[in-house]
């Protein structure tokens, strides 16, 4: 069974909690599909080439059809001409959206949490608030745990905690309503407030 490491006020291990057993039984393909959809939604649709109807010029036939010994040509803007159109090139009309059902999103999150717990990289504490709002205090939390990077999940994200973590390159803080399977998967460790963890497991 997947275990969540419980931390005390000093961020030391104080015990373990069990994740629901069904989390580890979720097909990992659900996680793959969600991450694929999430990354596709981040793609910037900027690559664009001009087709025959987009390029300027080329309305006049460059030379007569017959009698001069060369290949026939009807326009100087076909894809075989320098300065002409591009055949089958990318356009900015493409839609990269990939639909993922609400249930599948939920299953993906459950699997991601189970994978983190199996690696001993899922932690929970009563409070993760940084009341001082200082980055050095937030950095001390990460150093204390000895992890390379971490996702911090708050039940209710306050401004001071956001300011404290915002300037850390190896840390990202989110409200529990914004957590998703991709964020859980991409960080080496996940630290969730106990009340936030309860709301996540309750939904499932």
Curated annotation (Swiss-Prot):
| GO CC terms | ribonucleoprotein complex; ribosome
Q: How does it assemble?
A: Part of the 50S ribosomal subunit.
- SUPFAM superfamilies recorded: Ribosomal protein L4
Task: Report the protein's function.
Answer: One of the primary rRNA binding proteins, this protein initially binds near the 5'-end of the 23S rRNA. It is important during the early stages of 50S assembly. It makes multiple contacts with different domains of the 23S rRNA in the assembled 50S subunit and ribosome. Forms part of the polypeptide exit tunnel.
One annotated GO molecular function: structural constituent of ribosome
Q: Some GO term, biological process aspect, for this entry: which one?
A: translation
Name the UniProt record assigns to this protein: Large ribosomal subunit protein uL4
State the UniProt keywords alphabetically. Answer: Ribonucleoprotein, Ribosomal protein, RNA-binding, rRNA-binding
Q: Which family does it belong to?
A: Belongs to the universal ribosomal protein uL4 family.
Task: Region Disordered: list its residue ranges.
Answer: 49-75
Is-annotated flag, keyword Transferase? Answer: no
* Entry annotated with the keyword Nucleotide-binding: no
């Amino acid at each position: 069974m997947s275990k969540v490491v419980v931390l005390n006020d000093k961020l030391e291990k104080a015990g373990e909690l069990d994740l629901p057993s069904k989390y580890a039984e979720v097909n990992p393909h659900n996680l793959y599909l969600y991450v694929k959809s999430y990354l596709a939604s981040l793609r910037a649709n900027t690559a664009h080439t001009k087709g025959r109807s987009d390029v300027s010029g080329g309305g006049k036939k460059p030379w007569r059809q017959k009698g001069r010994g060369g290949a026939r040509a009807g326009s100087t803007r076909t894809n075989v001409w320098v300065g002409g159109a591009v055949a089958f090139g990318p356009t900015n009309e493409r839609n990269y959206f990939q639909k993922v059902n609400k249930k599948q999103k939920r299953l993906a999150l459950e699997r991601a949490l189970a994978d983190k717990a199996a690696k001993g990289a899922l932690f929970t504490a009563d409070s993760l608030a940084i009341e001082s709002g200082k980055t050095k205090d937030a950095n001390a939390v990460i150093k204390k745990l000895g992890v390379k990077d971490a996702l911090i999940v708050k039940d209710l994200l306050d401004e001071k905690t956001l300011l404290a973590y915002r300037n850390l390159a190896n840390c990202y803080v989110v409200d529990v309503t914004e957590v998703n399977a991709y964020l859980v998967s991409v960080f080496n460790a996940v630290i969730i407030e106990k009340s936030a963890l309860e709301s996540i497991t309750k939904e499932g």
